A protein has these predicted regions:
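C-terminal alpha-helical interaction appendages
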Residues: 1-170
């Protein structure tokens, strides 16, 4: 018996994928509706034309996830995991999501696509993101949580309830 994959099944898969890999897109109902309908239709038509369920699912998935295979969020999360070990693992996704907007100008300098992570420019993008994230954290503190280090620095600036003058302002 051949599996029959319906529109709600494709929608659930895409919704989960967006939550995990593209949290900034997860509530785009129009994207979920359109992609899941097209994938379900493509799956059904391929099976009706005599294609195997495996082939039909592969075609439907290609349609469902087109343009979403490269994830800015995953890239930032990877950099945080590798280069910013002070950020607790349980808070890394929150920090990565908060860094999407400040990192957008860096991403804008590249022609991103589904195969981008396998292209040579990916290494350059990661290097630029590392520098950009380091600069952003140096200027603003880590987004999404109260870092212990930042808290200690702030506490040291207080004397007798009065802020001490610092050379932090450039």
């Amino acid at each position: 018996a051949m599996e029959i994959y319906s529109e709600p099944w494709f929608r659930t898969r895409l919704d989960y994928y967006l939550r995990e890999r593209h949290p900034q897109l997860q509530y785009r109902a129009q994207l979920l509706d359109r992609r899941s309908a097209v994938a379900a239709d493509l799956y059904r038509r391929t099976c009706d034309a005599g294609g195997s369920a495996e082939c039909a699912l592969r075609l439907a998935d290609r349609s469902l996830f087109r343009g979403l295979l490269f994830s800015k969020f995953d890239t930032i999360d990877l950099i945080l995991a590798n280069d910013f070990p002070d950020i607790p693992e349980d808070q890394r996704r929150t920090v990565a999501r908060a860094l999407l907007t400040p990192c957008e100008p860096i991403f804008a300098g590249y022609a991103l696509g589904d195969d981008f992570a396998s292209r040579p420019e990916f290494r350059q993008l990661k290097a630029e993101l590392r520098l950009g994230i380091r600069q952003w954290i140096d200027d603003n503190g880590p987004p999404g949580y109260e870092a212990k280090l930042r808290h200690r620095v702030r506490t040291r600036k207080m004397r007798n309830g009065e802020p001490r003058k610092t050379n932090r302002n450039k």
